[in-house]
Amino acid sequence: MFSHTKKVGPTGRFGPRYGLKIRVRVRDVEIKAKKKYKCPVCGFPKLKRASTSIWVCGKCGAKIAGGAYTPETGAGKAVMKAIRRIVERKEE
């Protein structure tokens, strides 16, 4: 049985239950979690979610702790940006 369509994606399994807003949020989160990301160690797009906040590269085998549904959180990006600025200022 085919459980989803182009519009609703993986949340097609819920049918008309739970309301549209909740299903849209769940769809976005599930798509982000299932997506393959670029590995920060080897650079290949093989980083896959193993469990909550644990990401494993299929090529080099690196295990990385990240966000629950994406390998990099918004707060983590902001911190890395601030660190880069500090390093650049010290180099000048």
UniProtKB/Swiss-Prot annotation:
| One of the Pfam families matching this protein, by short name | Ribosomal_L37ae
Which residues does the record give as Zn(2+) binding sites? Answer: C39, C42, C57, C60
Q: How does it assemble?
A: Part of the 50S ribosomal subunit.
Return the cofactor note field.
Answer: Binds 1 zinc ion per subunit.
GO:BP terms for this protein? Answer: translation
Q: Which cofactor does it need?
A: Zn(2+)
First and last residues of each zinc finger (C4-type):
39-60
Q: Which InterPro entries match?
A: Ribosomal_eL37/eL43, Ribosomal_eL43, Ribosomal_protein_eL43, Ribosomal_zn-bd
Cellular component terms, GO, for this chain's entry? cytosolic ribosome; ribonucleoprotein complex
Q: A single GO molecular function, which one?
A: zinc ion binding
Keyword annotations: Metal-binding, Ribonucleoprotein, Ribosomal protein, RNA-binding, rRNA-binding, Zinc, Zinc-finger
User: Can you tell me which family this protein belongs to?
Assistant: Belongs to the eukaryotic ribosomal protein eL43 family. Putative zinc-binding subfamily.
- Briefly, what is this protein's role? Binds to the 23S rRNA.
- What name has this protein been given in UniProt? Large ribosomal subunit protein eL43
- Species of origin reads Methanocaldococcus jannaschii (strain ATCC 43067 / DSM 2661 / JAL-1 / JCM 10045 / NBRC 100440) (Methanococcus jannaschii)
Q: Which Gene3D superfamilies match?
A: 2.20.25.30
- Which PANTHER family does the UniProt entry name for this protein? 60S RIBOSOMAL PROTEIN L37A, LARGE RIBOSOMAL SUBUNIT PROTEIN EL43
